[in-house]
């Protein structure tokens, strides 16, 4: 007992010395200074006003930056689409086949005039390959129409011969109708959708078993379904494989559009986080333990496509598959990377953007195989097709997919005399256009040197018809003749299948998408081979095309170079704070495709500005830049370099795990015409950097204000316990700012490096009360992540902490000012409308020293509490009751100001209830999404199971405390043990610390902490010695 008392005294002494060092006199002095007119403001007030003004200014700048339009390559360039949709309800799929058959529905899409319609028996006889489309959060089943229509038009149209698949077949698109459910906010809804889709796949496969057309065709019946998911629909597709009703091997190809694979976009519901952990653990184990179940490693492919910077619904970084799906089974790509698309796309447009839907439709038709029961090609062929269709072809890993590796369609040519070969050192880039056509030999032979690590072959052309371009890669070949001596010849192959498409860049070109699919202009074609591939061959034979194939602006540029093609620019963000990084392209010594690598610029949070100046007249094309990152596969093309270029990247992002051994460097691949010297300067674009803070830290708007409000409440209760006076929130906030703001700012800076220490991460993980965070670092050594605080790994980004802190202070003060303004208005209105009699009566009833309640009011509060508890147990989620309690607390604050009395007890009641109202206001955004889900389901006349949200204990303390507040009681400041006071203060401090460290990724748990604190406040407000 003595040791416990000694601990209490020591703890109280430490708190008094180090934490709450301002006293009541300071607060009262500030109150008097605020109320007195003409008095000079104190230094503390000026300090607070400076911090508040700075935060408000930063908030306005961030909002203005967020609302400002994108420029250059980040501008949206999607074209509108036309289609003739029709939807056939699959009426047979009802509650007999799925318990959710009344809530959800299944439709079959038919493109009018293309797909087979109803037959004479008023049924649709399917003969294609099944595809299931899963809409996303609040999505509709009709979103399937764009991709499905493009697939039908491509298959039944004139472009069918362009498909690289002799075994392709028409696709039957089924689409799920989820009544626009909010999948991202409610875990139970996500599980329901996954369960329904598994039942739908079972039913879809049974339809084909009954199809007369399929039996007549002699083709094997389908055993799997291709799945296309938009937004959260892509996550539903992956969750499907983890459920018990999943049919084994029924899914082997998943294509997702803007789906947040790596982390949940919203953390309002703990079930969502648990589902993500279980899903990612399941998929990771399937690829890790391939000996037990080889199906996933040998058959399943997952492709993630994201729209990039224009996606304002969720950060594009969240779509990464890194660390979840091996590179042999899937990858993430950006629409700016995809050939023939080359434009960023917003979250909704990604399902209808004309350029993308054509590419996706072509890919789907090339992935399928009607002769296989799985109806898809083998995994290596699917992945190779996906990489060729969705990646730029300039990635470091792209050479593995070139046909030049294993091309055996040999063309035998006569032996070339050694004197006809031109070495790379003797040769300048070969430029062929209308002006130089007659100066070039008809045949040109380029000798390929060996043991040259920097050897590169590059070709760029604007010719429309590649058949006019005759280029061969040859080996010296000895042909044995049985009737005579050995004959020497050359064995050559054509690289025609390895050409990649890059955006057109002439003087009148503005945007990369101007040469995308369906445009009037055609893109450039290019070849780019490294030394490893070239080492298989001895020389290159190039024959110039016919002169009639050249238009005035057409050109062919060929180069075999041994010059170092990559330049490393060793600048870091700290150096860019002081000056810009300058580098140059020298046309006389550098290859026309030169790469500038920035190994220390890898943060997705920082945007850069690139200023370019170049010289040269009559350039055959305008220089352009391919900005790229190898993981994830993001390439962005920049034209019109005379204007400032904005560099935005998606590499190392907050809260996103990444593999540490991958190269995260930013690469700027400059493609320059001959005789064009270029100077480049790179600096930080602060305005665009602030623009991207909002999309990545939206959840901080709920977490950080709750932290500050809790910290101020801890100080309010400390002063209340020491003086029996409960100060108002705004005044305490000013005192806290003047006393602790420098310390808090320093802490917000130091938290970033501290929480990146491996030992600290493990410690924080072990102390996490929610138990839903599962940092990849703990499971795999090569996976890095920062799951706590702001999710930042770079020391340079430590400034984000103080910036968000200033903005948080401004937001909290404006909320407190709003409540104070409401109270002031209520008092003024009450002053005019209330009579002296009613005031006297209310004083007698409400503000008796012994708090003698009217029995009628007490009875009504008890009945109301019982109804709310019963409603939570039987029907509504506790989040809805929280919203109602917020309104009750607001009513209490209003009533306290309607009957205003200038007494200490009334002041305590008013300040305490106003502060608690502000605390509830900070928790309200956390609970609001679940209320939307409930009201949406209620409107659809269906009650989705809220299993984890019917726990009355999750709201009971708040119910009782709010009702207790309505009875005008306040936690006692006297006759209370010292340890109880420390528990109250410590609880608020813990809530404040939790909201900072865990809050952004665990918002749902903040409600439970507030609930526990409310229970404790209720306990301290009880007078256990009283009969009441």
Swiss-Prot record:
Key words, A-Z: Endoplasmic reticulum, Glycoprotein, Hydrolase, Membrane, Protein transport, Transmembrane, Transmembrane helix, Transport
Glycan-linked positions: 166, 299, 530, 586, 679
Residue spans crossing the bilayer: 51-71, 699-719, 740-760, 799-819, 867-887, 915-935, 948-968, 979-999, 1002-1022
GO function term, MF aspect, one: phosphatidylinositol deacylase activity
Domain of life assignment: Eukaryota
EC numbers: 3.1.-.-
SUPFAM superfamilies, A to Z: alpha/beta-Hydrolases (SSF53474)
Bilayer topology term: Multi-pass membrane protein
Protein purpose: Involved in inositol deacylation of GPI-anchored proteins which plays important roles in the quality control and ER-associated degradation of GPI-anchored proteins.
Protein name as catalogued: GPI inositol-deacylase
Originating species: Eremothecium gossypii (strain ATCC 10895 / CBS 109.51 / FGSC 9923 / NRRL Y-1056)
């Amino acid at each position: 007992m003595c040791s416990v008392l000694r601990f209490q005294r020591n703890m109280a002494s430490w708190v008094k010395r180090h934490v709450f060092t301002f006293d009541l006199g300071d607060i009262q002095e500030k109150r008097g200074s605020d109320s007195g007119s003409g008095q000079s403001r104190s230094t503390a007030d000026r300090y607070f006003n400076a911090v508040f003004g700075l935060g408000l200014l930063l908030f306005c700048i961030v909002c203005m930056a967020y609302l400002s339009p994108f420029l250059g390559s980040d501008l949206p360039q999607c074209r509108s689409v036309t289609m003739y949709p029709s939807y056939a309800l699959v009426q047979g799929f009802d509650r007999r086949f799925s318990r959710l058959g009344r809530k959800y529905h299944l439709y079959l899409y038919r493109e009018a005039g293309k797909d087979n319609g109803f037959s004479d028996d008023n049924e649709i006889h399917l003969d294609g390959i099944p595809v299931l489309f899963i809409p996303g959060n609040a999505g509709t089943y009709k979103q399937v129409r764009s991709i499905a229509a493009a697939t039908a038009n491509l298959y039944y149209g004139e472009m069918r011969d362009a498909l690289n698949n002799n075994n392709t077949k028409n696709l039957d698109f089924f689409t799920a109708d989820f009544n626009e459910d909010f999948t991202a906010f409610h875990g139970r809804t996500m599980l329901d959708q996954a369960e329904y889709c598994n039942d739908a796949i079972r039913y879809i496969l049974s339809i084909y078993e009954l199809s007369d057309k399929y039996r007549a065709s002699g083709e094997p019946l389908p055993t799997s379904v291709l799945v296309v998911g938009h937004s959260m629909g892509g996550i539903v597709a992956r969750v499907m494989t983890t459920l018990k009703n999943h049919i084994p091997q029924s899914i082997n190809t998943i294509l997702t559009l803007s789906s947040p694979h790596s982390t949940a976009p919203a953390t309002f519901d703990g079930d969502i986080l648990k589902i993500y952990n279980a899903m990612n653990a399941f998929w990771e184990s399937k690829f890790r333990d391939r000996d037990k179940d080889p199906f996933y490693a040998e058959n399943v492919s997952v492709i993630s496509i994201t729209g990039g910077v224009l996606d304002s619904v969720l950060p594009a970084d969240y779509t990464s598959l890194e660390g979840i799906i091996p590179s042999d089974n899937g990858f993430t790509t950006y629409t700016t990377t995809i050939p023939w698309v080359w434009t960023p796309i917003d979250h909704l447009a990604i399902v209808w953007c004309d350029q993308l839907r054509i590419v996706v439709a072509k890919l789907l038709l090339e992935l399928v195989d009607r002769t296989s029961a799985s109806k898809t090609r083998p995994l290596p062929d699917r992945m190779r097709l996906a990489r060729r269709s969705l990646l730029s072809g300039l990635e470091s890993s792209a050479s593995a997919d070139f046909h030049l590796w294993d091309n055996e369609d040999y063309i035998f040519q006569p032996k070339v005399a050694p004197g006809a070969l031109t070495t790379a050192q003797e040769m300048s880039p070969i430029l062929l256009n209308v002006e130089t056509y007659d100066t070039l030999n008809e045949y040109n032979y380029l000798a390929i040197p060996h043991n040259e690590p920097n050897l590169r072959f590059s070709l760029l052309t604007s010719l429309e018809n590649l058949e006019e371009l005759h280029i061969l890669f040859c080996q010296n070949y000895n042909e044995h003749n049985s009737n005579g001596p050995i004959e020497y010849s050359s064995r050559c192959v054509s690289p025609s299948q390895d050409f990649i498409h890059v955006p057109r860049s002439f003087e009148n070109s503005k945007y990369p998408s101007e040469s995308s699919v369906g445009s009037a202009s055609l893109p450039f074609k290019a070849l780019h081979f490294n030394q490893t591939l070239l080492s298989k061959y001895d020389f290159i034979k190039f024959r110039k095309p016919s002169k009639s194939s050249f238009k005035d602006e057409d050109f062919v540029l060929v180069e075999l170079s041994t010059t170092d093609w990559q330049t490393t620019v060793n600048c870091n963000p700290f150096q860019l704070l002081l000056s810009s990084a300058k580098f140059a392209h020298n046309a006389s010594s550098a290859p026309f495709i030169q790469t500038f690598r920035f190994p220390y610029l890898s943060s997705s949070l920082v945007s850069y500005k690139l200023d370019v100046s170049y010289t040269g007249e009559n350039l055959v094309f305008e220089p352009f830049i391919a900005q790229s990152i190898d993981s994830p596969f993001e390439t962005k093309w920049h034209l019109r370099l005379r204007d400032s270029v904005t560099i935005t990247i998606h590499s190392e992002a907050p809260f996103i795990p990444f593999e540490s051994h991958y190269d995260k460097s930013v690469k700027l691949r400059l493609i320059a015409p001959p005789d064009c010297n270029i100077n480049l300067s790179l600096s930080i674009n602060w305005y665009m950097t602030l623009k991207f803070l909002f999309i990545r830290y939206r959840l901080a708007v709920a977490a950080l204000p709750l932290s500050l409000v809790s910290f101020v409440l801890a100080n309010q209760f400390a002063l209340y316990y020491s003086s029996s006076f409960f100060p108002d929130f705004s005044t305490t906030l000013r005192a806290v700012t003047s006393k602790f703001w420098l310390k808090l700012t320093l802490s917000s800076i130091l938290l970033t490096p501290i929480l990146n220490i491996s030992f600290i991460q493990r410690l924080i993980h072990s102390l996490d009360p929610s138990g839903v965070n599962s940092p990849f670092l703990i499971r795999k050594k090569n996976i890095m992540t920062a799951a706590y605080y702001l999710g930042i790994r770079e020391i340079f980004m430590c400034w984000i902490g103080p910036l968000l802190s200033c903005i948080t202070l401004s937001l909290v003060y404006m909320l407190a000012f709003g409540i104070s303004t409401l109270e002031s208005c209520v008092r003024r209105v009450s002053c005019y409308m209330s009579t002296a009699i009613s005031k006297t009566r209310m004083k007698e009833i409400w503000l008796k020293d012994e708090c003698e309640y009217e029995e009628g009011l007490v009875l009504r509060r008890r009945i109301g509490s019982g109804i709310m508890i019963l409603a939570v147990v039987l029907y509504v989620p506790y989040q809805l009751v929280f919203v109602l309690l917020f309104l009750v607390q607001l009513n209490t604050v209003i009533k306290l100001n309607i009957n205003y009395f200038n007494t200490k007890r009334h002041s305590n009641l008013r300040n305490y209830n106003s502060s608690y109202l502000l605390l509830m206001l900070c928790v309200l955004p956390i609970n609001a999404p679940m209320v939307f889900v409930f009201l949406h389901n209620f409107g659809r006349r269906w009650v989705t199971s809220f299993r984890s949200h019917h726990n009355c204990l999750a709201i009971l303390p708040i119910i009782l405390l709010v009702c207790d507040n309505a009875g005008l009681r306040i936690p006692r400041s006297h006759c209370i043990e010292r340890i109880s006071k420390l528990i109250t203060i410590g609880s608020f401090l813990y809530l404040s610390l939790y909201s900072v460290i865990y809050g952004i990724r665990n918002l749902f748990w903040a409600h439970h902490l507030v609930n526990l604190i409310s229970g404790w406040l209720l306990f301290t407000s009880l007078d256990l010695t009283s009969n009441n």
